[in-house]
UniProtKB/Swiss-Prot annotation:
Protein name: Pup--protein ligase 1
Metabolic or biological pathway: Protein degradation; proteasomal Pup-dependent pathway; Protein modification; protein pupylation
GO molecular function: ATP binding; ligase activity, forming carbon-nitrogen bonds; magnesium ion binding; ubiquitin-like protein transferase activity
Family of this protein: Belongs to the Pup ligase/Pup deamidase family. Pup-conjugating enzyme subfamily.
Active site residues of this protein: D57
Function field: Catalyzes the covalent attachment of the prokaryotic ubiquitin-like protein modifier Pup to the proteasomal substrate proteins, thereby targeting them for proteasomal degradation. This tagging system is termed pupylation. The ligation reaction involves the side-chain carboxylate of the C-terminal glutamate of Pup and the side-chain amino group of a substrate lysine.
Lineage of the organism: Bacteria, Bacillati, Actinomycetota, Actinomycetes, Mycobacteriales
Amino acid sequence: MQRRIMGIETEFGVTCTFHGHRRLSPDEVARYLFRRVVSWGRSSNVFLRNGARLYLDVGSHPEYATAECDNLIQLVNHDRAGERVLEELLIDAEQRLAEEGIGGDIYLFKNNTDSAGNSYGCHENFLVARAGEFSRISDVLLPFLVTRQLICGAGKVLQTPKAATFCLSQRAEHIWEGVSSATTRSRPIINTRDEPHADAEKYRRLHVIVGDSNMSESTTMLKVGTAALVLEMIEAGVSFRDFALDNPIRAIREVSHDVTGRRPVRLAGGRQASALDIQREYHARAVEHLQNREPDPQVTQVVELWGRMLDAVETQDFAKVDTEIDWVIKRKLFQRYQDRHGFELADPKIAQLDLAYHDIKRGRGVFDVLQRKGLVKRITEDETIEAAVDTPPQTTRAKLRGEFITAAQEAGRDFTVDWVHLKLNDQAQRTVLCKDPFRSVDERVERLIASM
């Protein structure tokens, strides 16, 4: 499947600092954030005009699920648009706090852990064909996903009883299973719950919940692009060396703690391989695969950055990727800060900087400051991100959903939508079932809109 439906779900961390007045619980802060949403959507679980879903998840975490996208740049734009949507809620909530005399600064973090040790996720979704062995997909994908943090982790300072250490991944310490149908209880690498949000006879949805939330556009593109390409190769019958891991959960932590990528992890049958070895194998197969597939500049860009990052890890010279990969950008930032101020990695100021990197408020968040200074590479533009806040992808089912929502809201009509249903809540209860996520034109939807 060379044209694939993809999406990213991001849970955001929330905190609020108060100006000497009464403190609010995380639940209360979340309610302030979503008050405007509830006022027009009558719920804290809504679909937006750009086709995305916005809702309050377990533990008072705002979650933004992008609309269905069918290319990587489009997906990065819509992922970044989610930050803008949440930033608008943040600004609105701060104004409400001020009006009510509470006063405080709300922070939304696009990260995966808080100071209390809780974890919240960034989930990738890929449409796959129902035909074929799902077990083969998970078998081949698992070693890739365990070691993928080497090329696209968000980076984190982990405080241990012995000392502070820099890790590749924020999520690695919180994953407890390889493949499972649960998401919160056991936190698997791949979630197998069968909810295709499409024609179940043709498709299923691969739900990857091991990834970090990325600030860098290049890292997001690399994270999703490499996974999509490995999926494509599995479907095309490409053979890979057997890297079945003896203990994926131990391996994911070992990989996260080793920025050299050279620490051996134990494979099934007693063999060993490093994260760098495993990623090199997948990358080599990808380079070969590109010779036999239709040219795609975005995929070529992904494979080029993948190779460049592996070279950087191998030589430990990160100069060629230090504006593109989150954990590399972050580590360089920490090292400069330590050199300037003489701090140890365990210093609370470093932990503060770690958190501030993920602050999504423009002008305040550290990543945004780096971006404004030209110290991180862009692959999108502000204009296309702003457009994605209100406009759905024009090449997928999201276009139908977005147009329906816009028309219903402008006509003042009561409606209900989810990923596959568009329903007018009138006497006739007219509903259109959109089971094909690739389809962006549908006469049934056009008739429903025309009838408003």
